[in-house]
Amino acid sequence: MNLEVEIAGVKLKNPVIAASGTFGFGREYSKLIDISEFGAICTKGITLKKRNGNPQPRLCEVYGGIINSVGLENPGVEAFVNEELPFLKGFNTKIIANINGFTKEEFVELTKVLSSLVDMIEVNLSCPNVKEGGMVFGKDPEKVYEITKSVKDVASCPIIVKLTPNVTDIAQLAIAAEKAGADAISLINTVSAMAIDIETRKPLIKMVTGGLSGPAIKPIAVRMVYECFKKVRIPIVGMGGIMNYKDAIEFFIAGATAIQIGTVNFINPKAVCEIKEGIEAYLERKGFNSIKELVGNINI
């Protein structure tokens, strides 16, 4: 069965990608599974300088998922290039660098450093814009356009723009990214959420709110992938609560070219193998010759 997909000329041997933030830089998981099983690995979020992240507690379990407010803890781009990237290049899989900036200039600088070293870059626009009162870049179509264009102007590899679901109309963000030259979009990022300890009356997350991931957000993610698929022609990487192959199939039918799996990696490190096998069995059972035939193939 042909599971190969292509995003802006980059061929992935299968459409299952390790999502940013749940896989670190692959070192821990490499002791449990062959991480070459993934079609690609999307790195933990990378910033220009080292970040220690937010204060603890910054992770809590809730019905149907996890709320996190890790705060982009990472060693910084220089340490990533010198220490983590050589390790990742030892595996037979594509590497996607997830970049995070707090100004347009930081996104541009990160792209200049990384675009010749990795297969693709995923631009996380859920960072606060420190020059404009902390508003999240990705909520404003004009900012999405501006940053995407600035990054594309200096990039030597394909650019994936990661979209936030915490907006009224995500398709408008997708359109802005496409107009600015994005090679693909990925969605959805986490959904803004909160949980409270009723005994202490304190939020379970030190920063009060965080991002919800896991199966609770899957129906939202599927809807948003479908809405974007109807509006743009560039490939969509779908994510949000994928726990098994059936969840993955929904995303392909809704219009995703590839998928990312995140929260499930915490629960089942072997999920990538099980999801791949399930997709293959489904395609054979339904008479498809390749995964590409399923993308956007919805009966309405």
UniProtKB/Swiss-Prot annotation:
A UniProt-annotated Pfam family: DHO_dh
Cofactor: FMN
Pathway: Pyrimidine metabolism; UMP biosynthesis via de novo pathway; orotate from (S)-dihydroorotate (NAD(+) route): step 1/1
PROSITE patterns: DHODEHASE_1 (PS00911), DHODEHASE_2 (PS00912)
InterPro entries to which the protein is assigned, alphabetical: Aldolase_TIM, DHO_dehydrogenase, DHOD_1B, Dihydroorotate_DH_1, Dihydroorotate_DH_1_2, Dihydroorotate_DH_cat, Dihydroorotate_DH_CS, Dihydroorotate_DH_I
Entry GO terms, CC: cytoplasm
Keywords recorded for this protein, A-Z: Cytoplasm, Flavoprotein, FMN, NAD, Oxidoreductase, Pyrimidine biosynthesis
Catalytic residue list: C127 (nucleophile)
EC main group: oxidoreductase
Protein residues bound to FMN: S20, K44, G45, N98, N124, K162, I188, G214, G240, G241, G262, T263
Biological process, per Gene Ontology: 'de novo' pyrimidine nucleobase biosynthetic process; 'de novo' UMP biosynthetic process
Residues binding substrate: K44, N68, S69, V70, G71, L72, N124, N189, T190
Cofactor: record remark: Binds 1 FMN per subunit.
Gene Ontology molecular functions: dihydroorotate dehydrogenase (NAD+) activity
Catalytic activity, as annotated: (S)-dihydroorotate + NAD(+) = orotate + NADH + H(+)
Subcellular location: Cytoplasm
Family: Belongs to the dihydroorotate dehydrogenase family. Type 1 subfamily.
Function: Catalyzes the conversion of dihydroorotate to orotate with NAD(+) as electron acceptor.
PANTHER family: DIHYDROOROTATE DEHYDROGENASE (FUMARATE), DIHYDROOROTATE DEHYDROGENASE (QUINONE), MITOCHONDRIAL-RELATED
Record-given protein name: Dihydroorotate dehydrogenase B (NAD(+)), catalytic subunit
